[in-house]
Amino acid sequence: MEKFNAMRTRLLQHLQKKAIRSKSIMTLVCLLLASASAFAQTKTVTGTVTDAANEPLIGASVLVQGTSTGTITDMDGKYSISVTPEDVLAFSYVGMTSQTIKVGTQNVINVTLKEDSQVLAETVVIGYGSAKKRDLTGSITNIKGEELANKPAMNPLSSLQGKVAGVQIVNSGRAGSDPEIRIRGTNSINGYKPLYIVDGLFNDNINFLNPEDIESMEILKDPSSLAIFGVRGANGVIIITTKKAKEGQTLVNINTSFGFKKVVDKVKLVNGSQFKELYNEQLANQKDDPFDYAGWDANTDWQDEIFQTAFITNNNISITGASPKHSFYLGVGYSYEQGNIEHEKFSKVTINASNDYKITDFLKVGFQFNGARMLPADSKQVLNALRATPIAPVYNNEYGLYTALPEFQKAQINNPMVDVELKANTTKAENYRASGNIYGEVDFLKHFTFKAMFSMDYASNNGRTYTPIVKVYDAAVNGGISTLGTGKTEVSQFKENETKVQSDYLLTYTNSFDNGNHNLTATAGFTTYYNSLSRLDGARKQGVGLVIPDNPDKWFVSIGDAATATNGSTQWERSTLSVLARVIYNYKGKYLFNGSFRRDGSSAFSYTGNEWQNFFSLGGGWLMSEEEFMKDIKWLDMLKIKASYGTLGNQNLDKAYPAEPLLTNAYSAVFGKPSIIYPGYQLAYLPNPNLRWEKVEAWEAGFETNLLRNRWHFEGVYYKKNTKDLLAEVPGISGTIPGIGNLGEIQNKGVEMAVTWRDQIGDWGYSVSANLTTIKNEVKSLVQEGYSIIAGDKQQSYTMAGYPIGYFYGYKVAGVYQSQADIDASPKNTLATVTPGDLKFADVNGDGEITPEDRTMIGNPTPKVTYGFSLGVDYKNWSLGIDMMGQGGNKIFRTWDNYNFAQFNYLEQRLDRWHGEGTSNTQPLLNTKHSINNLNSDYYIENGSFFRIRNVQLAYTFDKSLISKIRLQALKVYVNIQNLKTWKHNTGYTPELGGTATAFGVDNGSYPVPAVYTFGINLTF
């Protein structure tokens, strides 16, 4: 280095003597000097990274902050790295608190990393407050907003599929659709939806939220966490906290993505020639005349005709800033999604704004607002594309019309393109949502906090539908043109408004006693909740002569024939008044106690004397790892044993006033001369003065543990829930009025497990996580012995004591009759006259005959097990995330190809039909007149198990040192693939099939769940 400096001195002296003034040469010299100076300042820094016990940390990361330059420690915890004095070194290790140190004049930098206390002291939102997760005795899953962002989902809940134990999420491929969520099974015959709480306000859905505006999401599943929500907590609670500013400089974030959606799993149907082969055989079996195929020689794939590759985009911008006294957040989003059926489109505009003001050291006020405008898609069905024959052409070019289907189909099925093209955009709908709160918070007497919050949510939905005149080409009619349906236009219209108003008044006391041995947080509160809905419906048809114009500006019920007008309305309101209390206590940080109480009064039961009900929970925990006898176990960081018990409530019933029934239309009477018709009315259902809430008794026991410097986390829990006093409607007998009573009990029980491993080896970081849930659902009692609730289009779903809710009911198939001798040797079938080739039903009750009494449970739609896997890998600026999920042990009932006297296209599996002795023992003969083959049986049951690569995301984050030159704080680009591949067993588009509480898991031609490919960019400045 001394020689280099001497050479530099001689060069300068030489230049001065020659007095060279050339600008280019001086520039070159300056560059040389700068380069030499930088070279002179670069040096090697060494050191050792250890833990608090002075043990070396192997594979700890040592990174030059703001760059991708770095190294890792060796087997002795030692490292060596080239740096400059201005550099800052960042030291990190999984489960440890990171440190940053400026190099300066140091040549040796030894670092001791401490255990990350945040791993043990994670704070979660629990409703009416927050708490350290280690102090809680229940099961709460925290989802960070980052896990929801950058995903092509209109509803943030869709992205949680497979990521949370105990939570089953069923997604639909329809544009803008909401997922179905069941937490720890189906708890009631009256509903399964959890309670959503958005910034403190109780809600029924969160489709108006932008995923980019969510800070965190907590999913509460256990009685210890849920009892404080009383009558609303029975089906679980999902708490959403939207983003607020953090103290620091003003930042602007822009996140935009775009991509496309594609149907990748089509239903396997026969082609044109195969259809003719099977249909000819069917006509022969039915002893019908052969069909004349003249003009019917197409080979149409109707699925290809109706489906499209759809466009999707999400765009968001947010501005955030904070000072010690004031913080604000403003986020605006725009989303647009096309459906995979042509002409379907959904769009949403959202706004999220919050302001918080710290007026004094003890007084804080603020507000939160969420708004949305949604234009729902005019969704179409895929059913006709599955049923229409492939021999029919799509379009007749000579007439310029779509083609009617052949005689054997057109009475039941339209050309699928009629709905897709000729009835496209005939429904116009707009949904508006405004939700928000204002609050004030006062700290006083050192340990007390009082918070008052007023919240309101207003939803306004309106829609109009137009029925056009549809003409098609039909060679079978004179003139070649026929009109579908009534041949008259029609309009219908609805308007619906819903209001929710809530007020909360909470007093919280927090203190520690006896040198921190006793730690207490106590909360008491008073809340009110009001909910009302008003809806008007109307319709008019075309009058004599005048056609209602095909113009959205004319689609109102003021147009059309007044004599054809129909109308209807719905209106109800409901209110709840509550007091609540909760205690979170620990002794010496290792003996935990949680207790909560809530007393609810509901207007729904105000005429019964049972309007008030108490709910409570008790929970205990033991942090064994804090005991002295556990301290020497170096690999154990945390071990907690926990258990809780509680009671919850449910008032969900589709009747607005279950205790005070409304009137409904009844028989009319004629009196007088001239005769006058007097309409009659009757009670919709009999009042029950003893009607009361549904009550859930729940308990769970489990453990949580962190091992190996908090790199490994594992938790497991056993849970059990009994819903008693089920609100059930008892049908009237022989035309009498039905009644409502508390007449049943449902039980759900199972096991939840979740495990995560995180580690970092130098520039490489990785994480692996998995979760698994088992569930057993059983109806313990219902009304009376032998009573069943029957649901579903094919009356295939039964709810009955001793069986799972919504189980599939029908005959078990023992094969296919191969011959008359086979029929004679089998139990006598009293249901119908059978022939060889018909389905052979099992004699379940063993009486020697096939009768309706042989029907039994043939499938359970509730999965026995659901599971999920996640893999994350980071290398320098690159990150890769893969989410997988699946379920098993459930069945699907296929209904879309099961109707008497209707001729549909054939599933590909029907090529293996019975057509002679020994040809098949699984597929019956082709004959729609043999109705026995259409009876509900396990011939229509399919395996609902599946495994799916749910999400794959690859991202690159640019070095801050590089992007700072263009004044950016952060820049990330990413690609995302959703629903990359599904391995399934059923014949339909998707094994994900939702439904109602008592009829789900039924494939009635369900909409496909597409693969979604997107590219995005996220930048902050």
Residue ranges and their predicted role:
Residues 290-291, 303, 472-475, 602, ...:
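Extracytoplasmic gating/loop element in the C-terminal half of outer-membrane beta-barrel translocons
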Residues 148, 152, 174, 193, ...:
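Extracellular/periplasmic, surface-exposed regions of secreted and cell-surface proteins
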Residues 253-297, 537-541, 741-744, 758-861:
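Conserved small-residue
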Residues 1-352, 357-372, 404, 435-436, ...:
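Short, small/polar-rich motifs associated with maturation and membrane association
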